[in-house]
Amino acid sequence: MNTEASQDQTVTETPGVRLRQARESLGLTQQTVAERLCLKVSTIRDIEEDNAQANLASTFHRGYIRSYAKLVHLPEDELLPILEKQAPVRAAKVAPMQSFSLGKKHKKRDGWLMSFTWLIVLVVLGLTGAWWWQNHQAQQAEIANMVDQSSAQLSQNGGQPVPLTDDNRDAIAPTDAPAPVANGQPVPLTNHSVSAITNSAPTTSSVPTTSSATTSSVPTTSSVPKINSTEPVDTANTNTTMHQEGAASAAVSPSQVPQPGMPTGQPPLPTADAGVSGSASSVGALVMNFTADCWLQVVDATGKTLFSGIQKGGAVLNLAGKAPYKLTIGAPGALTISYQGNPVDLSKFIKANRVARLTVGVE
């Protein structure tokens, strides 16, 4: 009997039973208690049935019981000893702190990645610089080769650049021998001499030629008596012959002036100066003004090389041929070009500081 009474007393001494009895004595319902404590009805029911929620921390569970005891006017000192035996305070599980080594590993990996990225950037910059340097060296070597070729041509042509045209090739006629002289007086020109002089005249735009005036003003051997060294020469005939010879030379080429050191009986070869001066008025004319020494090569549409050599600063070169023209310029900044009165843009070649290869006159 004593054992059963002690068991009943133990049952009645649980916190949930004490709280339910106190609530019922005050005439409160579980719903009223839940509203006053701002809790769920299920939470009040679990407290009265001594069911501890698994997902609820013991600290919150003890706090709910204290609030419930205050509401039903039960002293906390009577409930706390029983509550500690029924639901002891569980130690909170503290997660171990992560070591800083993980962050160090991340930083180390990021450092290697940045180093590899910078290495790639440096390699790309190095390759770009090497490529630019190779192109620069190739351009300089090409310019040097052009200058060497031009120097060789100048040395072969007696220090003057000669435009390579068909007219200049025809100008080199077999007239190496000086004009015959009889008793210190010039002999009238023959038909062969007149044709040689006519062919030797340059045919650029700045040098006019009149073959009709030449042939009409020069006497032939059939109308001039032969001069013998033993016979006296008539002064009047000699003067007439000299005047006729002067008229013939004036009709052949008014712009030619005998070069010093050149035989008087041989017509001078056309040089680059034959194409310099004057304004280009013909269709397809190409005008180049040089501000500094520059190597130049001009080829027309037929493949004829109109000019190849070095021009000095201050010179003006006029060329006429069949368009379009293919130009190769060693120093684009040393000249200005106009085609049919319109300037040709060389700015992209000047900025690039390289040999200019362009075609002018393409329709």
Curated annotation (Swiss-Prot):
Keywords: Cell inner membrane, Cell membrane, Cell shape, DNA-binding, Membrane, Signal-anchor, Transmembrane, Transmembrane helix. Its main location: membrane. Residues 133-363 are periplasmic. The keyword Transferase does not apply. GO terms for molecular function: DNA binding. Residues 200-225, 247-259 have a biased composition (Low complexity). It is found in: Cell inner membrane. Residues 19-79 form the HTH cro/C1-type domain. It is a single-pass type II membrane protein. Residues 1-111 are cytoplasmic. Disulfide bonds: none annotated. Residues 30-49 bind DNA. Residues 151-277 are annotated as: Disordered. Cytoskeletal protein that is involved in cell-shape control through regulation of the length of the long axis. Belongs to the RodZ family. The helix-turn-helix (HTH) motif in the cytoplasmic domain of the N-terminus is involved in the formation of spirals to maintain the rigid rod shape. As this protein is anchored in the cytoplasmic membrane, the HTH motif may contribute to protein-protein interactions to form the RodZ helix, which is localized beneath the cytoplasmic membrane. The C-terminal domain may be critical for determination of the rod shape by probably interacting with enzymes required for synthesis of the peptidoglycan layer, including PBPs in the periplasm. This is Cytoskeleton protein RodZ.
